[in-house]
Amino acid sequence: MSDLKRSLSEAAAAAFQAAGLSPDFGRVTASDRPDLADFQCNGALAAAKSAKRNPREIAVQVVDVLKADPRLASVEIAGVGFINMRVSTDALSIRANEIAADPRAGAEPLAHPRRVLVDYAGPNVAKPMHVGHLRASIIGESVKRLYRFRGDDVVGDAHFGDWGFQMGLLISAIMEEDAFIRALLERLVEAPREFSKADEDKVMSEFAQRVTLDDLDRLYPAASARQKEDPEFKEKARKATAELQNGRFGYRLLWRHFVNISRVALEREFHALGVDFDLWKGESDVQDLIAPMVRQLEVKGLLVDDQGARIVRVARPGETKKKKLPDGSVVEVESPDPLLVVSSEGSAMYGTTDLATILDRRKSFDPHLILYCVDQRQADHFEQVFRAAYLAGYAEPGSLEHIGFGTMNGSDGKPFKTRAGGVLKLHDLIEMAREKARERLREAGLGAELSQEAFEETAHKVGIAALKFADLQNFRGTSYVFDLDRFTSFEGKTGPYLLYQSVRIKSILRKAAEQKVVSGAIIVGEPAERDLTLLLDAFEGALSEAYDKKAPNFIAEHAYKLAQTFSKFYAACPILSADNDATRASRLALAETTLKQLELALDLLGIEAPERM
């Protein structure tokens, strides 16, 4: 069961081939002029250039073949050789009934599914998520859902930031503030010989009582700022980090407490966003792989000493860029920069952990493709890591891809901040969206018949839909301006508008059930029925483009057009008050099919629609 665009492309390809030309010229697209045609093929122009022939002559040959296609009511040539096609109402009726009967609403599964890992969100221990995590979380979640829906075997990994210097900062700050914990940690440099599970539980209980998430939230920013001004404290934190990574027993227990309480809070926020992960693997999970990996890189001849540090050169011969030196002179240097694997102090670096993570993923999951949903400002870093991984044989060339995204900006065009100039916490952003959704629902007179609990649940869904759709309607690589008033409107291209149309269709279906009207065979006749069927048929094309470009905006665009087109259909074609049973049954089936496809699209965007408003 192919969508019309694909099946007509196949027919046009055969027609070009029959004319002695490449079938590649037979690409059919939706018409730029829906008033003239449903589909168009511009291949005659490209074919004419290639074959040095008249384009209209070629178009005539192709049209002569296509005219025999029973699905086409008309095939005409426009201008110098554009081919316009109008689909027959019978063919549209057949296609509408196919989509209605299909649980996937016209979406085809992949012929050759792959194993795919999506690395997204990147939350950190002891750091509350902020608005910068919004895009990584919701774009990554949508890409994961899309790939899984298409048929790939997909794993979503949060790639938890649970290692590194921030841990040493926190340990040092807590030891300074809490004498009891300091004394406890000083006793637990190594695991005591007789240290039972009960003893360990007792220590963890002490940590739970004395160190809360609020404490981490308070201590980390202060410690981070202090280490910039206080070299002694910075050195203490570095030492604590090294001892933690070398296995100091008490530090490991306290670190585990940091991870536990941070993850509980993070899972709560991700749940509110409708985001979930198959894996919560952290940077700490690959630490044991780093030393043998470094030795392996050395054996492969990839590690190079550079002023006491150890690097992997990833630039190819001749790849250079101009660099301005402090004295003002300009020199040519290799580009991309080498990947720093081991610092001059002997520490493994951020890129080293990423490289070890690729190695770990290959061993545990062996994915055909790993997608990294991370801010596009990290593009250079990923280019270095990916090239190093390919050189080392840790991944097949082309199997690692950075799907970068732009920033969410304030009205000044700069990354969004609070009025005080700070970074807005994600929790606070979600609550702002909920509050604005409550206000919008009351303004529109919606939700008045709901219980308080149901109203709150609906407001949450509306708020999250507003945030997600505002983001996902843009191509991920572009930045956009945050405007909560516009995002939460029930009019225009917004998430709440899509939810309203979904709820509206559900209301129609409930009334139909009350009146005992049952859906039946779809018979396409009216222009609004044609338009709706053609858009339902376009679902597969939208999914295919979103999949190929790792870009959910194509799904968002389709969902919006579908909601708009249904609204026009409903205004032009009465459903329950239609003048005969067959028409009522047909239009009701179109409404059911629209709802099925709309909610499928919303689910792929990570948006949940309420039953009522």
Curated annotation (Swiss-Prot):
Compartment(s): Cytoplasm
Sequence motif 'HIGH' region, residues: 123-133
Membrane-crossing segments per the record: none
GO molecular function terms listed in the Swiss-Prot or TrEMBL record: arginine-tRNA ligase activity; ATP binding
Main localization (coarse): cytoplasm
A matching Pfam family: Arg_tRNA_synt_N
Protein family according to the UniProt entry: Belongs to the class-I aminoacyl-tRNA synthetase family.
PANTHER family cross-referenced by the UniProt entry: ARGININE--TRNA LIGASE, CYTOPLASMIC (PTHR11956:SF5), ARGINYL-TRNA SYNTHETASE (PTHR11956)
Subunit structure: Monomer.
Name by which UniProt lists this protein: Arginine--tRNA ligase
Organism from which the protein derives: Caulobacter sp. (strain K31)
Species lineage: Bacteria, Pseudomonadati, Pseudomonadota, Alphaproteobacteria, Caulobacterales
